Amino acid sequence: MGCDAIRTSHNMPAPELVELCDEMGFMMMIEPFDEWDIAKCENGYHRYFNEWAERDMVNMLHNYRNNPCVVMWSIGNEVPTQCSPVGYKVAKFLQDICHREDPT
């Protein structure tokens, strides 16, 4: 493949992929969702963000925090909210969850 790291994007990865990365020595960055509370598309995660974001982040962190291949958590990629006046508050909210659940 010519790489040593894998970024999963927009959804939690299959456990089998994480186990394979552990076995093969790949590093992983895991990301739980592709948008926050501002829509990228009409039927996106923004519809559920306020209710589910913390639970989904905690679930991701608890599921994969002990896998040696996981070297980084992503709180989002190219999310429209980051450019809004409250974007930094949402980013801080998600960052705080990561630090609370995985203080390493």
Residue ranges and their predicted role:
Residues M1-T104:
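Active-site mouth of glycoside hydrolases
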